[in-house]
Amino acid sequence: MNTGNKAFSKAFAAVVLGAISIASAAIFMRLSDVSPTAAAFWRVTLALPLLYIWLRYDGESRALIGGKLQRTQVFTALGVGLWFAADLYLWHWSVAKTTVANATLLANMAAVFTAVAAFLFFGQRFSRSFLGGLVLALAGAATLIGQNASVSSEYIVGDLLGLATAVAYAGYILVAARARGTLTTPMVMFGSALTTAIVLLPFALIEEGTFFPASFEAWLPLLGLGWFAHVFGQSLIIYGLAHVPATLGSVTLLIQPVISALLAWWLFAEALGLFHLMGALLIFAGIMLARRGSRQNINTARQKPINADE
């Protein structure tokens, strides 16, 4: 295995592990006693001290900060935070205005929006294997979640917010991938978390519900949200996006509903049936097929001869 393939495999494994880790966010949110937007605010705010320590003692980050960062690099890192803030805020309101199943299913359309944006704005082309994997994974998500979805005019606002969530998360993935082209993982994570916290704070303060946890025990789910889901899980995804195409990253994140369903079954005794198993298998098959297609595209690009006139 050459160096490029090793980097790809390592990055893909990081994205998978990160996706599995951030699936716990839904469980921590459910255990929290603060308002949804407050939970999103505390998620990034509690992550900031650990991210700062990481940034402070990371040699590559110090070297880049010690030099002159270009404005585009700074704005890109801030853009990651803006897209993430939009994603979290829209997602929470979507859940409030429609069913959890509808909101989750529509948010998973981020994989489609990522692929469309990559094609329209960055000229990315996709192999049949990748497109087949995308369709399989989406079919799996629909099978896993769709049996609990509902079609009703009273959910139209929430459903539209669910689609908006998908657009925001697609923007987050694409901008994060571009940021990782010139910035380290801790730089992207700290800059985006700080931006997200600043954007969400006023919304968290004016939203109905609890802002501060009422007891020490009530802080524990928020610490899990900030330290495990965000610092550990989200950092793995950001790390992986330096070597894995954003489109493959977005498809891989479809593993989250599978893990969330397993955690809900284990912790809350929520029922799992045949359709859940079928959906999970389709998602796994789709991810592996998309991985194969993305890897083929990368290898083909490396093998293209360089024009001597360029």
Range-by-range predicted roles:
Residues 44, 218-220, 228, 254-310:
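C-terminal-most transmembrane helix of multi-pass membrane proteins
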Residues 21, 58-101, 107, 115, ...:
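Specific transmembrane alpha-helical segments of multi-pass solute transporters/efflux pumps
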Residues 19, 103-109, 176-197, 230-266:
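Helix-helix packing/entry segments at the starts of transmembrane helices
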Residues 51, 55, 117, 126-147, ...:
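Hydrophobic transmembrane alpha-helices of multi-pass small-molecule transport proteins
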Residues 23, 45, 81, 85, ...:
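Hydrophobic/small/kink-forming positions within alpha-helical transmembrane segments
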Residues 38-49, 92-125, 165, 246-265:
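Specific alpha-helical transmembrane segments that line the substrate/conduction pathway
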Residues 10-14, 38-56, 129, 133-139, ...:
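Hydrophobic alpha-helical transmembrane segments of multi-pass integral membrane proteins
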Residues 1-42, 47, 51, 79-82, ...:
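Glycine-/small-residue-enriched transmembrane alpha-helix faces in small-molecule transporters
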